[in-house]
A protein has these predicted regions:
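A conserved beta-strand element that flanks and buttresses the S-adenosyl-L-methionine
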Residues: 91
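Conserved acidic residues
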Residues: 88
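Class I (Rossmann-like) S-adenosyl-L-methionine-dependent methyltransferase catalytic domain
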Residues: 1-85, 99-185
């Protein structure tokens, strides 16, 4: 699979930049078969939720992580997902850029804002010079300022550029933004 790195170095570095505690409630949106949940479990995170539209992807990750880890696996489209809890950190590497319809983006951002009332977000999308399609689907591309503008209730702590190289050798530039929720005044 080409859509996630074998080692999620940038995401983990941003967890550190945000100072995410090991007992924080973390949701990985679109996590599917990615290795992030494996690394978080190995680093001692104990309150993890992985949401993905693909049950097959979730099963691959579940099989790797095993039953010992306390991970909630949720098969759902993030646009219709109605979580019944709050999270300290929302992580998304590569779902948001597939949302090319303004109404879909608004629904996604409304859910994010609702379920992260005091925490943080790590949002990663294709960079402005990234591909304009992925897996045959159109994508939106963002720079750090554009992502920050979409998150007015959050303050950017760190922004990074990362280049993912697919198994086929194709370079895909990403923009990562780590932002903390601003306290209401």
């Amino acid at each position: 699979m080409s859509w996630f790195p074998s080692e999620p170095h940038t995401s983990l570095a941003l967890f550190d930049a945000l100072g995410v505690h090991r007992d924080a409630a973390v949701v990985d949106v679109g996590g599917g078969a990615s290795a992030l949940v494996d690394r978080l479990v190995a680093h001692g995170y104990v309150d993890l939720t992985v949401v993905d539209i693909s049950e097959v992807g979730l099963d691959l990750a579940r099989d790797r992580v095993g039953d010992a880890a306390k991970v909630e696996w949720v098969v759902s489209d993030v646009l219709t997902w109605a979580p019944d809890r709050r999270y300290d950190l929302w992580h998304d590497r590569a779902v948001f850029h597939f949302l090319t319809d303004p109404d879909d983006r608004a629904a996604y951002l409304a859910t994010l804002t609702e379920v992260v009332p005091t925490g943080a977000v790590i949002l990663a999308t294709f960079a402005p010079d990234g591909p304009d399609t992925c897996s045959g689907l159109p994508v939106a591309r963002y720079g750090p300022d554009e992502l920050a503008d979409l998150l007015p209730d959050f303050e950017v702590v760190e922004a990074r550029r990362d280049v993912h190289v697919t198994p086929g050798g194709v370079e895909q530039p990403f923009t990562f933004v780590a932002a903390r929720r601003v306290a209401a005044t």
